[in-house]
Amino acid sequence: MSEVPSPEEIFEKSREEGERRLTRPFGELASTALAAGFDIAAGVILIAVLAAPLEHHFGKDAASVAGAFGFGVGFIFLVVGRGELFTENFLVPLAGLHGKPRNAWWKIVELWTVSPVANVLAGLAVACIVTTHGVLPVGSGRVLTDVAQKIHANGTLALFMSAVFAGALITAMTWFVEGHDSVGIRLTVAWVTGAFLALAHLNHVIVVTIELIFGIRYGAAIPWDFVVGNFFLAAAGNMLGGIGLITLNRFTQAKAGSGGGTRKASA
Protein backbone atom coordinates (compact mmCIF):
# COMPACT_ATOMS: atom_id res chain seq x y z
CA MET A 1 0.00 0.00 0.00
CA SER A 2 1.20 3.53 -0.71
CA GLU A 3 -0.10 6.92 0.38
CA VAL A 4 -1.67 9.15 -2.23
CA PRO A 5 -1.53 12.81 -1.19
CA SER A 6 -4.76 14.79 -1.14
CA PRO A 7 -5.24 17.77 -3.49
CA GLU A 8 -4.82 20.07 -0.48
CA GLU A 9 -1.43 18.54 0.30
CA ILE A 10 -0.27 18.78 -3.31
CA PHE A 11 -1.34 22.43 -3.40
CA GLU A 12 0.60 23.12 -0.20
CA LYS A 13 3.75 21.52 -1.63
CA SER A 14 3.27 23.51 -4.83
CA ARG A 15 2.79 26.71 -2.85
CA GLU A 16 6.01 26.19 -0.91
CA GLU A 17 7.99 25.48 -4.08
CA GLY A 18 6.30 28.42 -5.79
CA GLU A 19 7.36 30.78 -3.01
CA ARG A 20 10.95 29.57 -3.43
CA ARG A 21 10.85 30.23 -7.17
CA LEU A 22 9.42 33.70 -6.66
CA THR A 23 12.21 34.72 -4.29
CA ARG A 24 15.28 33.26 -6.01
CA PRO A 25 17.83 35.49 -7.74
CA PHE A 26 17.84 36.11 -11.48
CA GLY A 27 20.98 34.06 -12.03
CA GLU A 28 19.41 30.94 -10.55
CA LEU A 29 16.28 31.38 -12.68
CA ALA A 30 18.28 31.80 -15.88
CA SER A 31 20.64 28.89 -15.23
CA THR A 32 17.74 26.60 -14.30
CA ALA A 33 15.96 27.46 -17.54
CA LEU A 34 19.14 26.98 -19.58
CA ALA A 35 19.57 23.53 -18.04
CA ALA A 36 16.02 22.62 -19.06
CA GLY A 37 16.69 23.66 -22.64
CA PHE A 38 19.71 21.36 -22.71
CA ASP A 39 17.59 18.48 -21.36
CA ILE A 40 14.98 18.91 -24.08
CA ALA A 41 17.64 19.15 -26.77
CA ALA A 42 19.09 15.87 -25.47
CA GLY A 43 15.64 14.32 -25.82
CA VAL A 44 15.36 15.56 -29.41
CA ILE A 45 18.76 14.02 -30.19
CA LEU A 46 17.54 10.71 -28.78
CA ILE A 47 14.58 10.78 -31.18
CA ALA A 48 17.05 10.81 -34.05
CA VAL A 49 19.66 8.34 -32.81
CA LEU A 50 17.00 5.77 -31.90
CA ALA A 51 14.69 6.18 -34.88
CA ALA A 52 17.31 6.43 -37.63
CA PRO A 53 18.76 2.89 -37.36
CA LEU A 54 15.35 1.31 -36.74
CA GLU A 55 13.60 2.74 -39.81
CA HIS A 56 15.35 0.35 -42.18
CA HIS A 57 14.46 -2.77 -40.18
CA PHE A 58 11.04 -1.97 -38.72
CA GLY A 59 9.64 0.92 -40.75
CA LYS A 60 8.99 4.57 -39.92
CA ASP A 61 6.03 4.00 -37.60
CA ALA A 62 7.87 1.64 -35.24
CA ALA A 63 10.97 3.82 -35.38
CA SER A 64 8.89 6.89 -34.47
CA VAL A 65 7.49 5.12 -31.40
CA ALA A 66 11.00 4.17 -30.27
CA GLY A 67 12.17 7.73 -30.85
CA ALA A 68 9.27 9.13 -28.83
CA PHE A 69 10.12 6.98 -25.83
CA GLY A 70 13.72 8.06 -26.24
CA PHE A 71 12.58 11.67 -26.13
CA GLY A 72 10.94 10.92 -22.78
CA VAL A 73 14.43 10.49 -21.33
CA GLY A 74 14.87 14.23 -21.76
CA PHE A 75 12.00 14.73 -19.32
CA ILE A 76 13.68 12.35 -16.88
CA PHE A 77 16.79 14.57 -17.10
CA LEU A 78 14.51 17.55 -16.50
CA VAL A 79 13.08 16.15 -13.26
CA VAL A 80 16.33 14.67 -11.93
CA GLY A 81 18.30 17.82 -12.72
CA ARG A 82 15.59 20.18 -11.41
CA GLY A 83 15.45 22.11 -14.66
CA GLU A 84 12.38 24.15 -15.49
CA LEU A 85 10.56 24.59 -18.77
CA PHE A 86 8.42 27.65 -19.40
CA THR A 87 5.29 25.52 -19.04
CA GLU A 88 6.39 24.25 -15.63
CA ASN A 89 6.14 27.80 -14.36
CA PHE A 90 2.36 28.03 -14.54
CA LEU A 91 0.93 25.99 -11.67
CA VAL A 92 3.75 26.16 -9.12
CA PRO A 93 4.55 29.91 -9.16
CA LEU A 94 0.85 30.80 -9.29
CA ALA A 95 0.36 28.67 -6.18
CA GLY A 96 3.25 30.58 -4.62
CA LEU A 97 1.36 33.85 -5.14
CA HIS A 98 -1.24 32.75 -2.59
CA GLY A 99 -1.39 35.46 0.07
CA LYS A 100 1.33 37.56 -1.58
CA PRO A 101 1.12 41.30 -2.39
CA ARG A 102 0.33 42.45 -5.92
CA ASN A 103 3.93 43.39 -6.68
CA ALA A 104 4.80 39.68 -6.56
CA TRP A 105 3.26 39.47 -10.03
CA TRP A 106 6.43 41.08 -11.38
CA LYS A 107 8.28 37.88 -10.51
CA ILE A 108 5.72 35.94 -12.55
CA VAL A 109 6.38 38.25 -15.49
CA GLU A 110 10.11 37.65 -15.05
CA LEU A 111 9.57 33.88 -14.98
CA TRP A 112 7.38 33.93 -18.08
CA THR A 113 9.88 35.98 -20.09
CA VAL A 114 13.27 34.67 -18.95
CA SER A 115 12.33 30.97 -18.86
CA PRO A 116 11.22 30.53 -22.50
CA VAL A 117 14.07 32.62 -23.88
CA ALA A 118 16.70 30.70 -21.88
CA ASN A 119 15.06 27.36 -22.76
CA VAL A 120 15.29 28.11 -26.48
CA LEU A 121 18.79 29.60 -26.33
CA ALA A 122 20.13 26.44 -24.72
CA GLY A 123 18.38 24.28 -27.31
CA LEU A 124 19.76 26.47 -30.11
CA ALA A 125 23.30 26.15 -28.76
CA VAL A 126 23.05 22.35 -28.57
CA ALA A 127 21.54 22.18 -32.06
CA CYS A 128 24.37 24.25 -33.53
CA ILE A 129 26.91 21.90 -31.94
CA VAL A 130 25.46 18.48 -32.77
CA THR A 131 24.20 19.25 -36.28
CA THR A 132 27.78 19.75 -37.38
CA HIS A 133 28.47 17.15 -40.06
CA GLY A 134 29.57 13.82 -38.60
CA VAL A 135 28.59 14.44 -34.98
CA LEU A 136 25.36 12.40 -34.95
CA PRO A 137 24.89 9.02 -36.67
CA VAL A 138 23.94 8.77 -40.34
CA GLY A 139 20.20 9.24 -40.81
CA SER A 140 19.74 11.53 -37.80
CA GLY A 141 19.27 14.56 -40.00
CA ARG A 142 16.59 12.84 -42.07
CA VAL A 143 14.61 11.92 -38.96
CA LEU A 144 14.70 15.42 -37.49
CA THR A 145 13.95 17.03 -40.84
CA ASP A 146 10.83 14.84 -41.10
CA VAL A 147 9.78 15.84 -37.56
CA ALA A 148 10.13 19.54 -38.38
CA GLN A 149 8.26 19.22 -41.67
CA LYS A 150 5.33 17.44 -39.98
CA ILE A 151 5.00 20.39 -37.63
CA HIS A 152 5.24 22.89 -40.48
CA ALA A 153 2.54 21.07 -42.46
CA ASN A 154 -0.13 21.76 -39.82
CA GLY A 155 -2.60 24.62 -40.11
CA THR A 156 -2.88 27.46 -37.60
CA LEU A 157 -5.97 26.11 -35.85
CA ALA A 158 -4.48 22.63 -35.48
CA LEU A 159 -1.24 24.09 -34.10
CA PHE A 160 -3.13 26.21 -31.57
CA MET A 161 -5.40 23.40 -30.36
CA SER A 162 -2.40 21.09 -30.13
CA ALA A 163 -0.66 23.75 -28.03
CA VAL A 164 -3.65 24.01 -25.68
CA PHE A 165 -3.52 20.29 -24.96
CA ALA A 166 0.28 20.30 -24.68
CA GLY A 167 0.11 23.03 -22.03
CA ALA A 168 -2.55 21.11 -20.12
CA LEU A 169 -0.52 17.90 -20.30
CA ILE A 170 2.71 19.41 -18.98
CA THR A 171 0.91 21.30 -16.22
CA ALA A 172 -0.82 18.07 -15.19
CA MET A 173 2.61 16.44 -15.09
CA THR A 174 3.81 19.23 -12.82
CA TRP A 175 0.89 18.61 -10.44
CA PHE A 176 1.58 14.87 -10.32
CA VAL A 177 5.34 15.31 -9.84
CA GLU A 178 4.92 17.91 -7.10
CA GLY A 179 2.47 15.62 -5.33
CA HIS A 180 4.81 12.67 -4.84
CA ASP A 181 8.06 12.22 -2.94
CA SER A 182 8.76 8.87 -4.59
CA VAL A 183 11.58 9.28 -7.11
CA GLY A 184 10.30 6.30 -9.08
CA ILE A 185 6.83 7.78 -9.49
CA ARG A 186 8.20 11.21 -10.42
CA LEU A 187 10.51 9.79 -13.08
CA THR A 188 7.86 7.48 -14.51
CA VAL A 189 5.36 10.33 -14.82
CA ALA A 190 7.99 12.51 -16.49
CA TRP A 191 9.06 9.79 -18.94
CA VAL A 192 5.50 8.86 -19.95
CA THR A 193 4.56 12.53 -20.37
CA GLY A 194 7.56 13.22 -22.57
CA ALA A 195 6.84 10.16 -24.70
CA PHE A 196 3.16 11.17 -24.99
CA LEU A 197 4.18 14.65 -26.13
CA ALA A 198 6.48 13.25 -28.82
CA LEU A 199 4.16 10.46 -29.98
CA ALA A 200 1.31 12.91 -30.57
CA HIS A 201 3.61 15.64 -31.99
CA LEU A 202 1.97 18.11 -29.60
CA ASN A 203 2.81 21.79 -30.03
CA HIS A 204 4.78 22.50 -26.87
CA VAL A 205 6.38 25.92 -27.30
CA ILE A 206 9.89 24.89 -26.23
CA VAL A 207 9.96 21.34 -27.58
CA VAL A 208 8.60 22.24 -31.01
CA THR A 209 10.80 25.33 -31.34
CA ILE A 210 13.89 23.24 -30.64
CA GLU A 211 12.69 20.53 -33.04
CA LEU A 212 12.19 23.14 -35.76
CA ILE A 213 15.67 24.54 -35.15
CA PHE A 214 17.19 21.08 -35.50
CA GLY A 215 15.21 20.48 -38.69
CA ILE A 216 16.28 23.79 -40.23
CA ARG A 217 19.91 23.12 -39.31
CA TYR A 218 19.63 19.84 -41.20
CA GLY A 219 18.16 21.51 -44.26
CA ALA A 220 14.38 21.58 -43.78
CA ALA A 221 12.84 24.31 -45.96
CA ILE A 222 11.01 26.03 -43.12
CA PRO A 223 11.07 29.85 -42.92
CA TRP A 224 12.20 31.42 -39.67
CA ASP A 225 9.08 33.57 -39.54
CA PHE A 226 7.10 30.33 -39.10
CA VAL A 227 9.33 29.37 -36.16
CA VAL A 228 8.83 32.77 -34.51
CA GLY A 229 5.11 32.88 -35.26
CA ASN A 230 4.55 29.39 -33.92
CA PHE A 231 6.57 30.25 -30.81
CA PHE A 232 4.05 32.91 -29.81
CA LEU A 233 1.07 30.84 -30.98
CA ALA A 234 2.25 27.83 -28.98
CA ALA A 235 3.03 29.95 -25.92
CA ALA A 236 -0.51 31.35 -25.95
CA GLY A 237 -2.05 27.91 -26.40
CA ASN A 238 0.17 26.36 -23.72
CA MET A 239 -0.84 29.08 -21.26
CA LEU A 240 -4.53 28.66 -22.04
CA GLY A 241 -4.35 24.90 -21.53
CA GLY A 242 -1.95 24.93 -18.61
CA ILE A 243 -3.60 27.71 -16.64
CA GLY A 244 -7.18 27.59 -17.85
CA LEU A 245 -7.73 23.84 -18.01
CA ILE A 246 -5.46 22.51 -15.27
CA THR A 247 -4.14 25.12 -12.83
CA LEU A 248 -7.46 26.81 -12.04
CA ASN A 249 -9.25 23.48 -11.80
CA ARG A 250 -6.66 21.96 -9.47
CA PHE A 251 -6.66 25.05 -7.26
CA THR A 252 -10.45 24.86 -7.06
CA GLN A 253 -10.22 21.15 -6.24
CA ALA A 254 -7.76 21.84 -3.42
CA LYS A 255 -9.77 24.77 -2.05
CA ALA A 256 -13.02 22.80 -2.11
CA GLY A 257 -11.45 19.73 -0.51
CA SER A 258 -12.30 18.68 3.00
CA GLY A 259 -8.66 18.33 4.02
CA GLY A 260 -8.96 14.62 4.47
CA GLY A 261 -5.21 14.06 4.32
CA THR A 262 -3.58 11.21 2.49
CA ARG A 263 -5.54 8.33 1.04
CA LYS A 264 -4.45 4.75 0.72
CA ALA A 265 -4.02 3.27 -2.72
CA SER A 266 -2.88 -0.09 -3.93
CA ALA A 267 0.79 -0.15 -4.83
Model-derived features: where do they sit?
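Alpha-helical transmembrane segments and their helix-helix packing motifs
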Residues: 1-267
